[in-house]
Amino acid sequence: MRRHHPILILLLILTGVLSGSTAEAQILRSKRAVARERQEQRMREQTKSPYERFFTTDTTSMRSAQGPFLSLHLKEKQLYMELPSESFGEEMLIAATVSDISNPQLGLPGFKNSGPIPIRFIQKDSVVVMEVVNNDLLYNPTDKSALVKNIRKSYTNVSLHKFPITGLSSDGKSVLFDVTDFFLNEQRFFDALVSEVGSYRLSSSPRPDLSSFTTVKSFETNATVGVERTSYVTLTNSRGKGLEDYPTTYSVTYSLLRLPAVPMTPRLSDTRVNFFLTEKDILRSDNHQIETVNFIRRWRLEPVDMEALKRGELTEVKKPIIYYVDDNFPERWRAGIKAGVLRWNKAFERIGLKDVVQVRDFPKDDPEFDPDNLKYSCIRYVPVGIENAMGPSWYDPRTGEIINASVMVYSNVIKTLNNWRFVQTAQLDPAVRSKVLSDSLLTESLEYVIAHEVGHTLGLMHNMAASAAYSVDSLRSPSFTHKYGTTPSIMDYARWNYVTQREDEGVSLDPPFLGAFDYYAIEWGYKVFPDLEDNFLAESKVLQEFVSRHEGDPIYRYGVQQVESRLDPSAIEEDLSDDPIRAGELGMRNLMYITEHLDEWITDDPGAEHRGELYEQILAQAYGYYHNIFMMVPGIILRQTSESSGIPRHQVLPKERQREAALWLIEHAEDFRKLGLEELVGHIPYASLRPFDLVQQDLLKMTMLNTGKLAISYYFDPDSYSPMEYLEDVYSHIFGPTLRGASHLSETEIALQDAFVRYLNASLQYGLQNVYPVGLKSDALSLSYKADKTVCNHAGEENGLLGFGNGNGFPEHLWAQTVNMTSDYTLSYALKVRDLLKRTIPRTRDANLRAHYRLLLGRLDKSLDK
């Protein structure tokens, strides 16, 4: 057995002990180092600025969108904006657009319920403030006089929202602030939901716990924030609640856009041309008076080669208007969409500008392209069951410069086109007698719709007077229609040629490529004047002379779309020709023929749903013809004209035409029911509801609702058709059979008498409150109540007043009470009808007819004996 030396054993023991002590020492030193490092880390954190801590702490889930305009950071469900210091005080636009919604009746995708608002960010103490910029006043910025300073005090900005500052960058070049509350919660300036649904008023209760941010994007000159919200919606009207606490989820996209550093030279408006406007107050340097003027909305089109333009040669523009077409459009739509955009180049070429309007597909190889980027104007496909399209735009409120424009095309617009083509042209065109339009017809129809919407994005409003420039005979002429189409402007609501009859061979049924008025409007709005050096006052004088040269030609007449006050029969929607009566009669003849052949032409429709839709459109079209004739009473033609032209600004139709229209409605109201073919009622579900009976009831009421309107026209022209003459005609026609001692009345004759007595009673009981003409409110009638107001509006015409006219040319207001004596007129006829009934009842043998007369008499007694 081997023996171990005691000293060796001792050494081994000592080594082990020493070794363990070293390890413990190392651990101790390590712990001290960690503690020291943590202490140093805490000290470093304490020395970091709040800005630095934001970007270094809890950043795992942070999403950022960075750009030269501004940056957005989404962190822990909070949204922060980082704005360059140099951008404070810069003017921007902000707006909110509905992106999607659970119920499209409560908000339209792609729609802004309020226009873009000019804003700027400023720093006040320890917060950032968003101000609504008041740029209504235009003045010479070099004028430092006390007068200007005092005037500017009436045009101050509005503080809209304040944001807490999170931090400042170390170099002082940017400010970080919390914008969560502003974007996540409902803002009264940016309502996403509509305010009304039919007769119901909408109110909503937001659910903040269900709101969240969805997207943040930042680009060179703009940025977007996407938000999803949920609200409980309640619909209320005078009869109660239609909905209560109805849950609705919707997405909103907020967009911010930097305005151009150098404003565009504006162009003053002219009420004789159809441009959208932005209103300004100008402080005139010559007399220090403030004058309200309007600038038109238009794109900044600067020629590349000004010398070529001066020589009368075509030149391109520095920045063309490019529309990008959504990839989501069905392939068979795309050709028509692109052709509709490019139509407008023909108008720009007339003023020397080439390839102004361009169209491209959404780019595949451009990583910066984004349809939400306001740098790009897009034609968007909206897959929602809405039969519509629209062309909204963003513009600089300082000058009217259009910066971005989009065309929103809803998927069911195809349904509208199919129905229009069938109902308006099937009497002559076999190609439209099908459930689905052919590719060629679809392309042609879409091209027209898109061209109209692109016209809006170019700044053009509707011109509802255009179609009244052509006669019925012209619309039935092959040579005329192939050259001029159905209207001088595609910005009118004049569709296809419903006047043309089956015997009119070779007639064109289509609207024009572009009308004469469209070329004229583009020339007025976009013509470049190289020698006037961007002097908008000098340009305005030249342009006024240009318009005056065309003033007497109906082809170049602009008729504003009538909203509240509807007095002018020559400026209405969905009409053709200068003769509504003749056009309506021809249109009704065509609709009758189409209705008779509906089953024969549409055979692949086992459930009759499509025929039901077409039949509904037929009735709507027919009602439109009646309404166009109804507008001839009072028949006040409104024109925006210069005094030097000698053309009256308002002119009442001849008395004979007014009376003809009034009597036509009474005599032909019964004809509407002829569209209610019993063979259709038997197998088309919609027709089985007998809607034509309901429409006819409305038409019967329409025949006697002209007293108040005639009071207006009679006020302007004492030689025109008077309210008393009208009531006498209505009375003589409606009670004519009774006056002649008829022993039997038709259903229509009974309904007319019943409607007339109801009208008389309503007038006696409620006066002007409930008895105003259809489409006219008693407190919103038309034209100036002061004889000198019109003179003042144009008194400075020869002295170079800023622009021509006032705004868009909407008629001034006239309080109905000043001229409307409906109650006075109807009292005498209520007494007259009562006397007739008292004489007639004793000698009426038919029990049913006698009961009818007694009912009318009882109603009149109740009103007259109060």
Predicted feature descriptions by range:
Residues I27-F329, A347, I351, V356, ...:
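Auxiliary tRNA-acceptor-end handling modules of aminoacyl-tRNA synthetases
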